Amino acid sequence: MKNSNEISSSQSLKNNGSDGFFNTSLMYVLAACLASFLFGYQVSVLNTIKDFIVIEFGWCAGKEVNCDDSTLKSSFLLASVFIGAVVGSGFSGFLVQHGRRFSLLVIYNFFILVSILTSITHHFHTILFSRLLSGFGIGLITVSVPMYISEMTHKDKKGAYGVLHQLFITFGIFIAVLLGMAMGNVPEEVNNPLGTFQQIWWRLMFFFPCIISILGIVLLTFFFKEETPYYLFEKGKVEESKEILKKIYGSDDVDEPLKAIKDAVEQNEAAKKNSISLMRAMKIPSYRYVILLGCILSGLQQFTGINVLVSNSNALYKGFLTNEWITTLSVIMTVVNFLMTFPAIYIVEKLGRKTLLLCGCAGIVCAFLPTAIANLINNTSDVVKKLSISATFVMIVSFAVSYGPVLWIYLHEMFPSEIKDSAASLASLVNWMCAIIVVFPSDIIIKQSPTILFFIFSGMSIVAFLFIFFFIKETKGGEIGTSPYITLEERQKHMGKSVV
């Protein structure tokens, strides 16, 4: 039982500046979430301006905008972001070791340079290189921002603030598509020159992240100058850690959260001593099994088709809509994606991880399979076209409340502590690699027939449903550092010591 002093201390922490959603901790989190916004923006920015770049750079001189040359180059540009992210995510672990706030400052400075480079490009090779760099920055964000948020947040608000990362990603996607509406319709004839506004605007859209990055630097340099309390404590700066905790909790009495950080640091050190390398884990059947499950689950997420809709919806909608409605519908889709992230905060704890994953996959199958069959029968019917458009929205809703957020929660709950970091990183790497596999040929397949994509995504979602149903276990309510796939006795046998 807690004594009266401990109860008073806990009550003090709850009744001070940490109360409510809007508090000091939130301000630090929002400064980091500007990087999350950059993530979403950079993934989606090409969606609405790709065809205008084709015309200005003359990739299809005398031909249609979707000529073979432009289709191939567009495929490289779309996939290059994900290729860069693979490299960046691998480098991010090294960067955060030098400080969480420091890593955010590096990211913001990096995107200033990338934005300038992209906005002044005049050749395919330079824009391809700049998109690779954008992807590298996105890879850095995937680790740096969630870690900063987790360590700079009141313990009772980690879940609510943690979802802000995903919300700002979807908000960045929305803004990128919204700004693209100003470009208007793509000229009917590829030989028609772009208007002066269009020539300037698509470059300004590439430059826009520079403004957001400068804002992030200003906030972290002049207003939120402290490192996270966990990082400070880890580096032996206990008093500095205590001071920032006072700001986060709105109380001078922070002995309880300081002790929690101390325990976490000690547990982390113990985990490092007891950790099993990924190579060694792959040689042990029980560990290899859970690692493969995580990698397959992660890879299948991309084969639902989410990143084709996020990064290439305009190309997909061309077959179903007139030009003036294409970007408008993409904007509406991104709004739905943004708004439907909110319900996941509540239902993930109510329904559980496995149930949500199954429901999401079932929703995607119900959206895409009938649509694929209908398009196969008569793809010129107005009813079928409306069905195809509706299917993309059902898919977005199904994904946003399930596979989208739940995967990343599950990957940090399914692995035991001794392999969690390396196994989760490998699963994330598989996710990025599968994104490349899916996104790269999407332009080519859409040009051939969107029906093919509908069949692929519905078929893979059926595979994902069956895989989850038969192999994936529920992790809701599980203890931190444990795994439903490996018993304590099995873990102790391979670690050679007690595991708690």
From Swiss-Prot:
Superkingdom field: Eukaryota
Residues given in the record as beta-D-glucose binding sites: Q166, Q301, N307, N337
Main localisation: membrane
Catalytic activity of the protein: D-glucose(out) = D-glucose(in); D-fructose(out) = D-fructose(in); D-galactose(in) = D-galactose(out); D-mannose(out) = D-mannose(in)
NCBIfam families, alphabetized: SP (TIGR00879)
Coiled coil: none
Membrane topology: Multi-pass membrane protein
Function noted in UniProt: Sodium-independent facilitative hexose transporter. Can transport D-glucose and D-fructose. Can transport D-mannose, D-galactose, D-xylose and D-glucosamine.
Ranges facing Extracellular side: 47-75, 123-131, 188-203, 311-327, 378-390, 447-451
A Pfam family per the record: Sugar_tr
Source organism: Plasmodium knowlesi
Matches recorded under Gene3D superfamilies: MFS general substrate transporter like domains (1.20.1250.20)
Assembly mode: Homodimer.
Topological domain spans for side Cytoplasmic: 1-25, 97-101, 153-166, 225-289, 349-356, 412-425, 473-500
Covalent S-S links between cysteines: C60-C67
Subcellular localization: Cell membrane
One GO CC annotation: plasma membrane
Regulation: Inhibited by cytochalasin B.
Biophysicochemical property: temperature dependence: Active from 32 to 42 degrees Celsius. Retains 50% of its maximal activity at 20 degrees Celsius.
Binding locations of alpha-D-glucose: Q166, Q301, Q302, N307, W408
Family listed: Belongs to the major facilitator superfamily. Sugar transporter (TC 2.A.1.1) family.
Transmembrane stretches, start-end: 26-46, 76-96, 102-122, 132-152, 167-187, 204-224, 290-310, 328-348, 357-377, 391-411, 426-446, 452-472
Record protein name field: Hexose transporter 1
UniProt keyword annotations, A-Z: Cell membrane, Disulfide bond, Membrane, Sugar transport, Transmembrane, Transmembrane helix, Transport
